[in-house]
Amino acid sequence: QYNPNTQPGRTSIVHLFEWRWADIALECERYLAPYGFGGVQVSPPNENVIITNPYRPWWERYQPVSYKLCTRSGNENEFRDMVTRCNNVGVRIYVDAVKNHMCGSGAGSGTHSTCGAYFNAGNRDSPAVPYSGWDFNDGKCRTGSGEIENYGDASQVRDCRLVGLLDLALEKDYVRSTVAGYMNHLIDIGVAGFRLDAAKHMWPGDIKAFLDKLHNLNTNWFSSGSRPFIYQEVIDLGGEPITSSQYFGNHRVTEFKYGAKLGTVIRKWNGEKMAYLKNWGEGWGFVPSDRALVFVDNHDNQRGHGAGGASILTFWDARLYKMAVGFMLAHPYGFTRVMSSFRWPRHFENGKDVNDWYGPPSNSDGSTKEVTINADSTCGNDWVCEHRWRQIRNMVIFRNVVDGEPFSNWWDNNSNQVAFGRGSKGFIVFNNDDWHMNVDLYTGLPAGTYCDVISGQKEGSRCTGIQVYVSGNGKANFQISNNAEDPFIAIHVGAKL
């Protein structure tokens, strides 16, 4: 369950946030497979509440009504088609699984759900599952409001309502079996694993109990006895009784300190500088590398939700963001996830984005817009498609090329110019200082001419970007202007001319 089940030589996944299943299937075939992406995290595929105030926010998908595969992203047939087509080209599907709760306590009653299932939040009735009042934690929560009031009390974080969301009684075998039944339906279709949403709000023992009920993966695409890859959303920035390590027995965890700290360093806040990244990873107090799912930003914290605060870098900060993602994909720590977002009309009032609720690009009837592809391979319809940015795509390939090679040949200038290699396979150099960089560095690479995969790439026998000459002694000269479009250079043995 720590093994991501990606095909050999594929080392990253991408979160295609709020994409339709039909568009993901196409993207697997036309882009993700040819460029070496290992898999896709998809938005919750099960039926959710339709929220109209505000109008169709992204977070309505984190308010389940049933476990029918029926959302704005598509129906069960479209989901099955996506899983089959992506698996057939070697790209895995990881499902965002919402297990801690159902819809909000104030969601009302009726059939305002993505498949028309009736529910009554007031009396805890979800007949389409079915769940009833006995299946929720109302009687177990010990706060006056029924909500989480104090994160210093681990019991209420697990047993009370997270922002009003009806908390499932996961100590009940019926609830565990129901949750596992939904996940097994997805496993049998062919998914490779799950992100466990709000894992911090579930007891580790309850998670283990439903994970133990899961099937092995579908042998049409996975070797016999393969187990689903599990990564648990545990926001642990320190200072609370609930820690990531309490969840290691259930497989990997999301390391939220990673993006929060990397953002602070690349922004040069609080006296931080890139030279301090020499012992990046466990040396910064992160979870062990083989337990970590890492990312620069995610769908929550790119809009100020969740964890990390203002230091988080996103596509809105494109120049610094590309450097951060480049650093992540070059560094051996953790299993890497790339973000792929949609644009929304950000509007800050008193430091808060009042439009942080905006859902995906949609048509007048509320249906999600298709992902169109422009002639230059960027995306239209307000889909950002960071995973298609040349610098990010080429670093996904870099990580595949250097897989298994050690972190090596670190260099820094005691400030914000740093470099490191991955054994004899790759080397990357950053200039995040406010002055020109001109330095000769030992790369560890075989002699020859290499094509920088940030400013361009190798196309046939020519290079569309900067060329780097590695001499017989393994050294190369690197010149990076602080005004460069992208002030970093990356070379690897797959881009040798």
Swiss-Prot record:
Cofactor binding mode and count: Binds 1 Ca(2+) ion per subunit.
Active site (record annotation): D197 (nucleophile), E233 (proton donor)
E.C. number(s) listed in UniProt: 3.2.1.1
Residues that bear Pyrrolidone carboxylic acid: Q1
Subcellular location: Secreted, Extracellular space
GO biological process annotation, one example: carbohydrate metabolic process
Site (Transition state stabilizer): D300
Cofactor: Ca(2+); chloride
Annotated Ca(2+) binding sites: N100, R158, D167, H201
Keywords for this protein: Calcium, Carbohydrate metabolism, Chloride, Disulfide bond, Glycosidase, Hydrolase, Metal-binding, Pyrrolidone carboxylic acid, Secreted
Protein name, as recorded: Pancreatic alpha-amylase
Organism: Struthio camelus
Lineage: Eukaryota, Metazoa, Chordata, Craniata, Vertebrata
